[in-house]
Amino acid sequence: MVAKNKLIRFTATEVTDAFEKEDELIKQVQSNQLSQVLLLWQVKSPTLVLPAGKKWPVSNELEHALNTSGWKLFSRKTGGAPVPQVPGIINLSHIYHWPEGEPYNIKKAYLDLCAILTVFFEQLGVKVDVHATPYSYCDGEYNLNIGGQKIVGTAQRVLLKKGGGQVVLSQACILIDADVEKIVEPVRMCNQLCGHDDDIRGDVHTPLFHHISDRPSVDSLFQQLTSAFLTHAKTE
């Protein structure tokens, strides 16, 4: 199959539009129209992304509380926990075919993504470590951290491909210039109204701009992320 790769970048979009585009691209990879896609995006409106389901019910009370605080609410059919999206957080989705004949290995898929992101941070002179981050929102074993503080959260889904095989959706949320105390507020509010007692703390998170003197533009950071993916591809 001839490689058909695609790069899509949105510097200021809405969560709804980003996820609609992601779903469209997943279908194109599943049907072999594309070999792989890198989707990079940042929102223009503060939005709390909520996993759909009984654990996280969307109530009028929750919607009103978020709206009063200046946050939109978006519910989508995924696992995990609430994730805040604001300008100053870069998101990436890497959609690709898992190698044929190789059993899907979730640990390898996560570590591949973490390796690419490690290259991205190395380009900026920043050292990161991969581990869980207690008291962070949507905590996971494959967070990237600077000095024990979370800077990236990751997620993974595997989907079936037309004609057999598997497609991987690898996702990451990268804190660039977000106010960590403000972004945890809607998560705490959601936990409280949905009956969860998770202790979410702002100070266990850290944005990139606290660790570098330059302030690269979103376009520049998108380019460096793309470069990290290309560098990783050459070493495969």
Give the positions of each predicted feature.
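N-terminal lobe of the biotin/lipoate ligase/transferase fold
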Residues: 1-103
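Short secondary-structure junctions
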Residues: 7-9, 73, 126-131, 234-236
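Short amphipathic alpha-helical segments
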Residues: 17, 21, 58, 105-116, ...
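Short, conserved charged micro-motifs
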Residues: 58-61, 101-106, 180-186, 217-218
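Generic non-transmembrane alpha-helical segments
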Residues: 61-65, 69, 116-124, 224-232
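Contiguous, small/hydrophobic- and glycine-enriched helical/loop subdomains that border
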Residues: 89-134
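Long, positively charged amphipathic alpha-helical accessory segments at protein N-termini or as interdomain linkers
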Residues: 124-126, 157, 161, 165-236
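Beta-rich nucleic-acid/ligand-interaction surfaces
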Residues: 130-151, 155-159
